[in-house]
Amino acid sequence: TAAAVHWLAWRYTRDHLAAMTAALAFTFCFFRMHHGHGHLNLIWCFWIPLSFVAMDRWAERPTWTRLAVWTTVLVLQALAAWYQAVLIVVADALFLVWLFAVERRTPRFSRLILQGLVGALAAFAVVWPFARYYFILHSEPPSYASGASADLVGWFVPPENTWLGQWLLAHGVKGPRWIWGEVTVYLGWIVVGLASAGVVVSMRARDALTRRARFFILLGVVAAMLALGPFPSEVASGSFGWSPFGLLAHVPGLSLFRIPARYSELLNLALAMLAGIACAALHRRFGLRGRAVTMALTLLLLADFYVVKFPGGEPQPFPVPPVYKYIATLPAGAVLSLPDYARTDLWFQEADYQYFSTAHWHPAVNGDAREFPPQFVEVADRMKRFPDPDAAATMRTTGVKYVVLHAGQRGAEDLLAPAEASPDFRLLVRFDRDYLFEVVPAASTPAHTSAAP
């Protein structure tokens, strides 16, 4: 991410120190510190700044090679996560309009349309096989989006997990939020100050290179308006209307963007770029003294975002249980782990099974998700009746070959004895309180008969 933003900023400043400041301001912004411990897909956003570079080069000289580069960048970002797909579509759409409406790029219109259509079709062909599964999800109402929208407190009050936030709390100031809130999207005082100077510089500049940075003012304003979510009138009516977020909520696919505050990612990128513009102007005017000030401010902005007193404490080793490593030595077959935590109060523990599956890479039934297809829920509920015969029959028809029973966990301790006695399951191995059962093929299972009346 830092390298991508550095390259983008250098193209606007031709100043590596200023570009470095922009890169660090975005890479270590609090939004990324906030999501970096739980939503890794939300920090895999380095393709967005690269898309600006690729699109700029294509608009300058629309060759098929440059189109292929831009399309590839767009597709790779979209595949990272649906949120990132929406963010790059919004960012690139804005930049495309800027290039042709404001900067007056004038390539041959017919060539532009042809290449644009080909690129769009190619991107759709690659992304759709993955994206189509998102359309089982339902859109959230304005009331939900309103509760996950950014606000001035979230943007400008240092969180309690920063040095400044701790200082404010120590002096009795109420307002700092904790790091685990979706609306804790602190922008950073140093970055906002530098970006404000960058706005002035780009608006007053006479050289074409610096004037081009005005695009990031537009990007920041649009991102902020989207991050603020729906209007109060939309919340009251229960339907999206004419707010920027509400307008996008009417677009299929884009309507699945549930949490407006996450548009702050684009706002952070815009602020970082404008901060780089301010630093470059400082260097041009004051030379070495300006560079010294930039280095000092860069250290301060990093300190501004530095996370202290993280609620989860220091990361602790979390080894994969040996039973999953043993599965890697067995023939291919899908794996079910129990107890199943999906759709329970302990839903977050379901993701552990996804992590454990990296030890064997067999197909796994378990997994955390925002929403489950109804057919999957029905089948999974039958399998969770383990070790009932109906559960075994469902496993056979769906290709589930192995069942890991964590008998030491609440909700699983009473399943061990019936499982060991069941003719449908064969105990393969035991590691402490973790038991691995194999689903016995139907041909090898004695017929189940009902007791005579």
Regions found by a protein language model. Name each.
Residues 10-14, 56-69, 97-111, 200-209, ...:
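Membrane-interface junctions at the ends of membrane-embedded or membrane-associated helices
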Residues 124-201, 260-264:
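Periplasmic/ER-lumenal interhelical loops and adjacent helix-loop junctions
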Residues 2-12, 16-101, 115-128, 297-304:
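Membrane-embedded helix bundles of polyisoprenyl
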Residues 206, 283, 296-453:
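Extracytoplasmic
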Residues 42-50, 89-90, 190-191, 263-274:
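Membrane-embedded alpha-helical segments of multi-pass membrane proteins
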Residues 72-73, 96, 106-131, 142-151, ...:
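Hydrophobic alpha-helical membrane-interfacial segments at the cytosolic entry of transmembrane helices
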Residues 187-214, 218-227, 278-280:
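Hydrophobic, aromatic-rich transmembrane alpha-helices
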Residues 35-42, 148-151, 170-183, 222-270, ...:
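Membrane-helix boundary/interfacial segments in multi-pass membrane proteins
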